[in-house]
Each structure stands twice: as structure tokens, then as C-alpha cells.
Design a protein with these regions (language model features):
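Beta-strand-rich solenoidal segments
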Residues: 42, 48-245
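N-terminal "first-domain core" detector
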Residues: 1-48, 54
């Protein structure tokens, strides 16, 4: 093959994912894998979008960590582009930061508080464990690329769906949302989650932050486990009634 053909194939192969995600907002597309050792975090491959560009993490990055019992945020910083004769380089820097604010050129991967003598973990027992304060990697505020606006981690919606599903007999409104969460390969859109939360809890607000969405889903999950449907009736109590003529 000629050099021109090879360059065309190379450029086209990278254009395919860009076209696929061109209508998405900034945010994670494929979250970086994170392997935890006693003293280091090993950040693996991932794909994200920022300012209309796709960034692919191809090489692992090792970052040291230690207990502080204060929030530490694992961030990606998008560096200014650099020019050379043959190409333009868009590079990133991954680091731990004690500043919990996310600057305009940064994106959050996750955050944690670590106690002395403890080890950071990312295997969640249940939905509520996603928000455990200490010794647990928290991804509730990690933005995921979506249509119209960034959305929340699919770990949140999948944990919600798995726990809620066994309790939703006779709750078709909840079943529809839960099946979407369980079957979707991509993160669930923020618009759908917001519409579900607003209808389920009779809320008027049109926008919720990531931690607000998590809190509302937690409230809904508690109601579902009690048998309380969207119309306010307790399905369990109603099903147990015996009518005698």
C-alpha cells in the first residue's frame, strides 16, 4: 500500500468513534480502569471527550496515595496543545488533588477519603455503598458523556436497577425505567433519569446535580423496597387485603 492510503486508513479509523460520539457532551465514554494496590493507584485505559475532542488513554499511569481522612480527587487535566512539523499533540495529566473543585481544564475520575490503616476499595456491596464516606472510591460526581447534557455513571443506575427490580411487581412505571437501566450498554441519559425522578417524587425542579440524582434514586429505592408505587399506594398492603362478600 502507498503511504497516502495508509495515512487515509489511519485517519479514517480514528474518525469512526468521533462521528459516533460527535453529538455527545464532554465526559467519560469508557471510564478509566483503576487497579488499587497498597500504596498506588494504577489508572488504565479509557476514552473521554473534552472540548469536542476524543482522548484515548492507552498507557497505564501509576499514582501514589496515602491516608489523609480528607477528600482527594483523582483528576484528568487537559493540557494545552503542542505543535510539531507533522502533528498536533493533545496531552493530559492524571493526578490526585486535595482541591475538590473541578477547574475548566479538568475532569473528575473519582474521589475518596482514606483512613489510616485502611485500603481503598472499589467493589460496591450495594447501591448505598456507592456513597460510603471512607475508604471507598466515589464516582457519583464523575461526568459521563451524554446527549444534551453529561450524565451519571452507569454503575449508579445499574446498581439501582438490580436492587429495585425484584420489588417492582405491579409497578409498570418503575419497571420501564429499570429495564432501560439494565439493558443499556451506554450510560442512561440525564434527561430520562431526571424525568423519572421528577415524576416518581413529584418534584418541580428541572436540573439536579450528580449527588442530587443519587440521593433521589436512593429515596426511590427505599420506597420501592417498601412497596410504595409512583401513585403513593403501598402495593404490598393492597395485595394482602382479603375481600369477603
Amino acid at each position: 500500500m502507498t503511504r497516502e492510503i495508509l495515512e487515509t486508513m489511519r485517519n479514517t479509523s480514528f474518525d469512526i468513534p468521533y462521528v459516533y460520539y460527535m453529538d455527545h457532551t464532554d465526559g467519560m465514554i469508557v471510564p478509566c480502569s483503576i487497579r488499587v494496590t497498597d500504596k498506588t493507584l494504577i489508572i488504565g485505559k479509557g476514552l473521554m471527550k473534552w472540548q469536542d475532542k476524543l482522548y484515548i488513554m492507552t498507557q497505564p499511569v501509576t499514582i501514589g496515595y496515602y491516608p489523609t481522612e480528607e477528600w482527594r480527587v483523582l483528576k484528568i487535566r487537559f493540557l494545552p496543545q503542542t505543535e510539531s512539523k507533522d502533528f498536533t499533540l493533545f496531552d493530559t495529566d492524571i493526578f490526585l488533588d486535595e482541591d475538590i473543585q473541578i477547574k475548566d481544564d479538568e475532569m473528575e475520575i473519582g474521589r475518596f477519603k482514606l483512613k489510616a490503616g485502611s485500603r481503598l476499595r472499589q467493589n460496591y456491596v450495594d447501591f448505598h455503598d456507592l456513597n460510603t464516606e471512607f475508604d471507598t472510591l466515589n464516582v457519583i460526581l464523575t461526568p459521563f458523556a451524554g446527549i444534551g447534557s453529561p450524565t451519571i455513571s452507569p454503575q449508579i443506575t445499574r446498581h439501582f436497577a438490580r436492587e429495585a427490580y425484584p420489588h417492582t411487581i405491579g409497578m409498570p412505571f418503575d419497571n420501564g425505567f429499570i429495564c432501560t437501566c439494565m439493558n443499556s450498554e451506554r450510560p442512561v441519559s440525564r434527561e430520562l433519569i431526571t424525568c423519572y425522578v421528577k415524576a416518581r417524587l413529584a418534584l418541580k425542579k428541572n436540573y439536579f446535580t450528580g449527588d442530587e440524582l443519587y440521593a433521589h434514586l436512593s429515596h426511590i429505592l427505599a420506597d420501592i423496597k417498601k412497596g410504595i408505587a409512583v401513585d403513593g399506594y403501598n402495593r404490598r398492603s393492597r395485595d394482602r387485603k382479603i375481600f369477603v362478600e
